[in-house]
Amino acid sequence: MKTSYNLRSIAAKAIAQVLDQGLSLSSVIPELQKNISDKDKALLQELCFGTLRTLPQLEWIIQQLMDKPLKGKQRILHYLIMVGLYQLLYTRVPAHAALAETVNGAIALKKPQLKGLINGVLRQFQRQQDVLMERFQNNDSRYLHPSWLLTRIKNAYPELWESIIEGNNQKPPMWLRVNQIHHSREQYLALLEKEGISAFSDDHHPNAIRLETPCNVHLLPGFNEGWVTVQDRSAQRCAELLAPQNNEQILDLCAAPGGKTTHILEIAPKAHVLAIDIDEQRLARVKENLNRLKLHATVKSGDGRYPEQWCANMQFDRILLDAPCSATGVIRRHPDIKWLRRNEDIAQLAQIQKEILHAIWPYLKSGGTLVYATCSILPEENSQQIAAFLSSMQDAQCDYQHQCLPEQYSGDGFFYALINKK
């Protein structure tokens, strides 16, 4: 059945919103997916994420094929051409269909006079593809990262930077966290097998399962009933390290969208959890996740730098601080990060992290535990941040810290520090 929309033009609009307006893909896509079929939702996501993942390559190709870049009101067609090139390079969409749908995207974008240009560029690429791809392998853009970020990663990991870049450029695996209140991991693996969904357990994380192929969450047994949550295995380590106990007072700071909040309560259902986040809109996601899993926490809006505004004289047994960060460890999940972040952001984020750490420390009980976590791979936000904190706090002792790096079949890039109050 013929659809009333052109998916390639929708993808071009999404990419324009990211690159020209600085919006995140995760904020843009849900609205654009509202009136399209489930099958096309998945393809739209593939086109948007894939185009942004390979952006430098697509830009380079266009530079080779066009004398002048499209600018101003025609800029949207530059992104449409990118979508077309991505399809030809990386998807199973038949070339003739990719070509036709991309060219028709010009009509949907009210630029029918440029159909011929788009058709010409894409056909020229088809003719020159092998030669262009061979040349690209010697180009500086081949790492698909902005130069400032590439430099930072090289400096931080002189022996490992290439494997990190490779990990960042992969499509991410889909990890699940089994809700131990309902099922053991082995029981849930059996449920997946019954549904024909191939999956693997993880020796290092007791409730983690990796799917062989990502799927729609509504195909997962008992998803709506709260039997399982989508959460990367590295993120699952946060609540595991925190080791919450029933009846304890626990603060989950920077809690949205609630994956760690709910994990804490799955481990310790009778814990008293206060979930705080500065973003009221994202707090709605925390409440949704709590409701789906039938768990209870107190959810409040608040700035981690000013705890006196939202927790009065409370004292906590354990605090989980998933600090605001560059998110350089989750680029494979959010490739737009590469183009939304700027070099100067890192120092600003490190300052915010420092302020939150110092502000929240007095609210941790003596003998209590704080887990500091980020989804960053940059030392300024991680090991260096913790070293500076420990040197300024005589009653703080770090018993464990670890940096995970993004790997193809493993977890996201993540940092953890387990700090005890003497």
From Swiss-Prot:
A molecular-function term among this protein's GO annotations: rRNA (cytosine-C5-)-methyltransferase activity
Coiled-coil zones: none
Cross-referenced NCBIfam families: PRK10901.1 (NF008149), PRK14902.1 (NF011494), rsmB (TIGR00563)
Principal EC category: transferase
PANTHER family on file: NOL1_NOP2_SUN FAMILY PROTEIN _ ANTITERMINATION NUSB DOMAIN-CONTAINING PROTEIN, NOP2 YEAST -RELATED NOL1/NOP2/FMU SUN DOMAIN-CONTAINING
SUPFAM superfamilies according to UniProt: NusB-like, S-adenosyl-L-methionine-dependent methyltransferases
Record protein name field: Ribosomal RNA small subunit methyltransferase B
Compartments it resides in: Cytoplasm
InterPro entries recorded: MeTrfase_RsmB-F_NOP2_cat (IPR049560), MeTrfase_RsmB-F_NOP2_dom (IPR001678), NusB-like_sf (IPR035926), NusB_RsmB_TIM44 (IPR006027), RCMT (IPR023267), rRNA_ssu_MeTfrase_B (IPR004573), rRNA_ssu_MeTfrase_B_ent (IPR023541), RsmB-like_ferredoxin (IPR054728)
Domain of life of the native organism: Bacteria
UniProt similarity note: Belongs to the class I-like SAM-binding methyltransferase superfamily. RsmB/NOP family.
Organism encoding this protein: Proteus mirabilis (strain HI4320)
Biological role: Specifically methylates the cytosine at position 967 (m5C967) of 16S rRNA.
GO biological processes: regulation of DNA-templated transcription; rRNA base methylation
Active-site feature positions: 375
Keyword tags: Cytoplasm, Methyltransferase, RNA-binding, rRNA processing, S-adenosyl-L-methionine, Transferase
Entry annotated with the keyword S-adenosyl-L-methionine: yes
Transmembrane intervals: none
